[in-house]
A protein has these predicted regions:
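N-terminal ligand-binding/catalytic initiation module
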Residues: 1-25
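Glycine-rich phosphate/diphosphate-binding loop of Rossmann-like nucleotide-binding domains
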Residues: 18-22, 26-130
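Divalent metal-coordination and catalytic microenvironments
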Residues: 35, 134, 190
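Conserved helix-loop functional segments at active or binding sites
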Residues: 40-48, 140, 149, 165
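Short glycine/serine/threonine-rich phosphate/pyrophosphate-binding segments
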Residues: 63-67, 142-146, 168-170, 194-197
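Rossmann-fold NAD(P) dinucleotide-binding segment
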Residues: 123-131, 141-159
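Short, well-ordered coil/turn residues at beta-beta hairpins
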Residues: 135-137, 162
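Adenosine-phosphate binding glycine-rich loop
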Residues: 153-203
């Protein structure tokens, strides 16, 4: 009974909902919120200021969109979004208003905007955009070794896994790509970063 009440509960706090009039539920937002909070907590642990850090987001479903929104609210500059239909790159960072618009005006779980560039173009360019934070929050097993290496060469500090098993390893959990990433940068694994809904289920 608690679950049937809590998961569809409408978020009415203006500090937590991107748009109260849209009627976002706990289930819509909580996983992305947790992904963002894992990054915020990471920088608190290492006594580094998250404001002004730059982030690349992979995906634009509930997890990716909400994570981007909460990170932007915390002062992170979202410099790129890559999704199945295409993407957006803005090296100076998308405004919080733009991120909010992209989230609340979706008609599907994919990125929709007038200035979207093609997938081929964004996939060619985005891995070389300077960013400290990467949020893989699309499908599983998409993230290639070459893409991680390019991001590492452009100041990557932390990967927070919004998707389950985001690395393109043959192994189920911990293969050579994820091992390399974990040696070079901080990797917040899926079972920590994206457990928001699971945590709600344990309520």
């Amino acid at each position: 009974n608690q679950l049937s009440t809590g998961v569809p509960l409408i978020v009415t706090d203006q500090d937590l909902s991107p748009d109260i009039s849209k009627g976002y539920s706990v289930g819509d937002l909580i996983t992305g919120f947790g992904v963002a909070e894992s990054v915020i907590h990471y920088y608190k642990i290492y006594k580094d200021n998250i404001k002004g850090k730059r982030a690349i987001i992979q995906g634009w479903g509930n997890v990716a969109g909400a994570a981007a929104y909460y990170l932007a609210k915390s002062g992170v500059k979202i410099v790129g979004i890559i999704d199945k239909p295409g993407g957006v790159i803005k090296k100076e960072g998308l405004s919080i208003n733009k991120i909010t618009d992209l989230l609340i005006n979706r008609s599907s779980n994919f990125l929709e905007c007038n200035d979207m560039i093609s997938f081929n173009q964004v996939n060619k360019e985005i891995w070389d955009v300077q960013a400290e934070i990467f949020i893989p929050a699309a499908a599983s097993k998409l993230l290639l070794l070459s893409q991680i290496e390019r991001m590492i060469n452009n100041n990557l500090e932390v990967i927070s896994c919004g998707a389950n098993v985001p690395f393109a390893d043959k192994e189920i959990f911990f293969g050579p790509i994820s091992k390399m990433a974990d040696k070079k940068v901080s990797v917040i694994p899926d079972f920590i970063a994206n457990c928001g809904m699971a945590r709600a289920f344990s309520y």
